[in-house]
C-alpha cells in the first residue's frame, strides 16, 4: 500500500518503521525537507533494500497515496487539515494526535467532542478519517513490541472500509488492530492516550509501556 506520513518526529519514525516492516511503500513529508531526508536515510539504513521516498510537496504526495497519516501534534494536524483540505478529498486520513494542553496533564477538547471529530469536520465529506496510534508510544513502535508482546493499536472511525485499510497496515506491521467503533469513540481513545502519558512519570516506564487487551483463550 502507498502510504504518506506527514511529520518526521518520533511518532512518524515509529509508524514508518512498522509500515516498512509490513512491506508498504512509504513516502515522508515534513516542513523541514532535511528532517525528512535524514529520517528516510536512517530507515533505509536500518532495513536494507528499503526505498523510502521523500515528497517535495505535500499536496501532490497526498494525491498519489492510498492512506495519509498525520503524524503531527494536534495544532499541527489542524493546520494540515486546513492547508490540504482539497487534496485530501476521498482519501483515508489517519489522525494520531492527542489534544494535550501545554503542561501535558489535560486535554484541550471538551468531553463532548474529540480532536478527531474536530479534524473530520474540517475535511471534505468524502474524506474518511480514522483515529489510530494515539495510544501507542514511538519507542514501542520502533521495537514492534512491549514485553515480548505485539502492540495493540486501537482504531476508531465511521467508514468500515477505511478502518479495514488501516487494520491491514497495523496487522502487516506485526501489531494487533482493535476496532473500538465509530469515530466518536476517539473521545475515549484520546483520554486513554492522556492517561498513558501521565502514567509514564509515575511508573517510570520511559514511554516503553503499552495498553494491552487480554483476551480469553479461543477468542
Language-model region placement:
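NAD(P)+-binding Rossmann beta1-loop-alpha1 motif at the extreme N-terminus of oxidoreductases
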Residues: 1-42
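Rossmann-fold NAD(P)-dependent oxidoreductase module
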Residues: 14, 18, 122, 169
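Rossmann-like NAD(P)-binding element
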Residues: 46-92, 96-103
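General beta-strand structural signal in soluble alpha/beta enzymes
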Residues: 54, 128-132, 178-180
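Rossmann-fold NAD(P)-binding glycine/threonine-rich loop
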Residues: 97-139, 143-145
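Active-site-lining helix/loop region of Rossmann-like oxidoreductase modules
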Residues: 151-219
Amino acid at each position: 500500500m502507498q502510504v504518506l506520513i506527514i511529520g518526521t518526529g518520533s511518532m512518524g519514525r515509529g509508524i514508518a518503521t512498522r509500515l516498512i516492516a509490513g512491506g508498504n511503500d512509504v513516502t515522508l513529508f515534513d516542513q523541514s525537507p532535511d528532517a525528512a531526508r535524514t529520517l528516510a536515510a536512517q530507515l533505509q539504513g536500518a532495513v536494507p533494500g528499503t526505498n523510502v521516498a521523500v515528497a517535495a510537496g505535500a499536496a501532490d504526495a497526498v494525491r498519489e497515496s492510498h492512506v495519509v497519516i498525520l503524524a503531527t501534534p494536534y495544532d499541527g494536524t489542524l493546520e494540515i487539515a486546513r492547508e490540504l483540505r482539497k487534496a485530501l478529498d476521498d482519501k483515508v486520513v489517519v489522525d494520531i494526535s492527542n489534544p494535550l494542553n501545554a503542561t501535558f496533564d489535560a486535554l484541550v477538547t471538551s468531553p463532548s467532542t474529540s480532536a478527531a471529530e474536530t479534524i473530520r469536520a474540517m475535511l471534505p465529506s468524502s474524506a474518511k478519517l480514522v483515529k489510530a496510534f494515539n495510544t501507542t508510544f514511538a519507542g514501542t513502535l520502533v521495537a514492534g513490541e512491549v514485553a515480548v508482546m505485539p502492540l495493540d493499536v486501537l482504531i476508531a472511525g465511521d467508514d468500515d472500509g477505511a478502518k479495514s485499510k488501516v487494520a491491514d497496515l497495523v496487522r502487516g506491521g506485526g501489531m494487533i488492530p482493535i476496532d473500538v467503533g465509530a469515530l466518536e469513540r476517539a473521545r475515549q481513545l484520546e483520554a486513554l492516550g492522556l492517561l498513558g502519558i501521565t502514567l509514564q512519570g509515575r511508573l517510570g516506564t520511559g514511554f516503553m509501556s503499552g495498553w494491552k487487551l487480554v483476551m480469553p483463550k479461543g477468542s
